[in-house]
From Swiss-Prot:
Disulfide bonds: none annotated. The gene is astC. One of its GO terms (molecular function) is identical protein binding. Catalyzes the transamination of N(2)-succinylornithine and alpha-ketoglutarate into N(2)-succinylglutamate semialdehyde and glutamate. Can also act as an acetylornithine aminotransferase. The keyword Transmembrane does not apply. It comes from Salmonella heidelberg (strain SL476). Belongs to the class-III pyridoxal-phosphate-dependent aminotransferase family. AstC subfamily. It is an enzyme of class 2 (transferase). This is Succinylornithine transaminase. Keywords: Aminotransferase, Arginine metabolism, Pyridoxal phosphate, Transferase. Its EC number is 2.6.1.81. Its cofactor is pyridoxal 5'-phosphate. It comes from the Bacteria.
Amino acid sequence: MSLSVTRENFDEWMVPVYVPAPFIPVRGEGSRLWDQQGKEYIDFAGGIAVNALGHAHPALREALNEQANRFWHTGNGYTNEPALRLAKKLIDATFAERVFFCNSGAEANEAALKLARKYAHDRVGNHKSGIVAFKNAFHGRTLFTVSAGGQPTYSQDFAPLPPDIRHAAYNDLNSASALIDDNTCAVIVEPVQGEGGVIPATKAFLQGLRELCDRHQALLIFDEVQTGVGRTGELYAYMHYGVTPDILTTAKALGGGFPIGAMLTTQDYASVMTPGTHGTTYGGNPLATAVAGKVLDIINTPEMQNGVRQRHDAFIERLNTINVRFGMFSEIRGLGLLLGCVLQTEFAGKAKLIAQEAAKAGVMVLIAGGDVVRFAPALNVSDEEIATGLDRFALACERLQTGGASCG
């Protein structure tokens, strides 16, 4: 018999680094979830841009079950067929020539930063170790990646931090140019700052970073953990901008809910990562790569990408209608199905309260700081689910505006 558990048990048993919602989801199908009490929710959070094909997608379940009936794990002393097939699919679909598999976005970014430092050290010298990142970015929670993230709130308690990491203002080429020099080994940037407020980069900004990296022989790293695998209406956001990085990191949606991460790069850069320079126990395991291979098959099609663009338009139209009614947002921004509603000054700091009210109304949304409500729904969310979910979101906005909202 299974142990009966409640939300209160989290506070009793778990390390308190999160404050989960007061309900526990127990079942999902497509873009809908149900909690322990049977209440239904439309899911516009998508596990923070992870569940790209919704919950319990039949093709992903089939891929997982098929591999689970074969074998689960061997370790990095052996390779496996699903990992090799997935690597080839990623290479064929992108600029990359080499792939490193891991288990998360943080691990992918850690590998990217280590590669950049080693490449510079091997080809130029140990003095070329500087990393330029951007304020309010997010690249993970390892000590290296949280230091690159540019949000002191996440890193200030863990000093001393890795040295030679400096932060420029996002979308400010002059600020970046002042920091990038011949001692810079890498520039790491999100094409859309997700945690930082759903802020898309300008094309000129990314083009300028590409030119600066070329001039100073630094590697350009695109952190596409959140923007990747169809989220922006292209398989990867670099395709939207027409700016090709030297290294790309991907995770989240790549596994459709099953943990996986990957670092993509060229043969020249990958060549410095010789046996023993880096590694992972679970990375590239057959369960994760079998599921991810099926995710890529489904998402990397013109039909799916066109569908993302159409759904983007549907969200924007309905969110604008909501804003006409309530006047709560100063801006609605983002690419594809990564969207952010920026709160007006009078509602500043209330994004979390709106998310809580939305859950009470039966729709799950995210926040990106205190002033931005974030949406990252499944890429195949239906028109009916968009309409129903945003009707529920409108109810949450109405409650907040009329003072009917309550903290909790």
